[in-house]
């Protein structure tokens, strides 16, 4: 058990489409849970690897001193996974900036951005709204001349 001191924690969110994941990162011993369940229980396995990307990129030793708990809601399965991985990455960067040192935070940030920018920067694309005169955002109803 770590020494009892002031509570060191950061709260960060990750977003993708309508999915929002809120990550609480505090001093601990390497626990990462999503909605109260460990990452290993996420199905299917391909999406599980997407979630593990930040851990695999940075190595387990960087996550060893922190516990990350993520709550996620909204969106579909894939959007939720992308929101979670963004929240985990941003939480670690924020924790290192606030409680560790700037150099290691910059190192982590550079590794993540070099691999995939969406790990730290939200994707601004949203669904375009439907307009009148057609069944969707851009498609028009069929026109008949006779």
From Swiss-Prot:
<dbReference type="GO" id="GO:0006412">
    <property type="term" value="P:translation"/>
</dbReference>
<comment type="subunit">
    <text>Component of the small ribosomal subunit.</text>
</comment>
<dbReference type="GO" id="GO:0000462">
    <property type="term" value="P:maturation of SSU-rRNA from tricistronic rRNA transcript (SSU-rRNA, 5.8S rRNA, LSU-rRNA)"/>
</dbReference>
<dbReference type="InterPro" id="IPR000754">
    <property type="entry name" value="Ribosomal_uS9"/>
</dbReference>
<comment type="function">
    <text>Component of the small ribosomal subunit. The ribosome is a large ribonucleoprotein complex responsible for the synthesis of proteins in the cell.</text>
</comment>
<dbReference type="Pfam" id="PF00380">
    <property type="entry name" value="Ribosomal_S9"/>
</dbReference>
<dbReference type="GO" id="GO:0003723">
    <property type="term" value="F:RNA binding"/>
</dbReference>
<dbReference type="GO" id="GO:0022627">
    <property type="term" value="C:cytosolic small ribosomal subunit"/>
</dbReference>
<dbReference type="InterPro" id="IPR020574">
    <property type="entry name" value="Ribosomal_uS9_CS"/>
</dbReference>
<dbReference type="GO" id="GO:0003735">
    <property type="term" value="F:structural constituent of ribosome"/>
</dbReference>
<comment type="similarity">
    <text>Belongs to the universal ribosomal protein uS9 family.</text>
</comment>
<keyword id="KW-0687">Ribonucleoprotein</keyword>
<keyword id="KW-0689">Ribosomal protein</keyword>
<dbReference type="InterPro" id="IPR014721">
    <property type="entry name" value="Ribsml_uS5_D2-typ_fold_subgr"/>
</dbReference>
<dbReference type="InterPro" id="IPR020568">
    <property type="entry name" value="Ribosomal_Su5_D2-typ_SF"/>
</dbReference>
<keyword id="KW-0963">Cytoplasm</keyword>
<protein>
    <recommendedName>
        <fullName>Small ribosomal subunit protein uS9</fullName>
    </recommendedName>
</protein>
């Amino acid at each position: 058990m770590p020494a009892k001191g002031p509570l060191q924690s950061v709260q960060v969110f990750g977003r993708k489409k309508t999915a929002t994941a809120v990550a609480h990162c505090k001093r601990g011993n390497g626990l990462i849970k999503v909605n109260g369940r460990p990452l290993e229980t996420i199905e299917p396995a391909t999406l599980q690897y997407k979630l593990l990307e930040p851990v695999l990129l940075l190595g387990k030793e960087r996550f060893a001193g922190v516990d990350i708990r993520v709550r996620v809601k909204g969106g579909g399965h894939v959007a939720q996974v992308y929101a979670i991985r963004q929240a985990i990455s941003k939480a670690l960067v924020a924790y290192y900036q606030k409680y560790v040192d700037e150099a290691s935070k910059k190192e982590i940030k550079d590794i993540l951005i070099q691999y995939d920018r969406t790990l730290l920067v939200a994707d601004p694309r949203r669904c375009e709204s439907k307009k009148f005169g057609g069944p969707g955002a851009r498609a028009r109803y069929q026109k008949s001349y006779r």
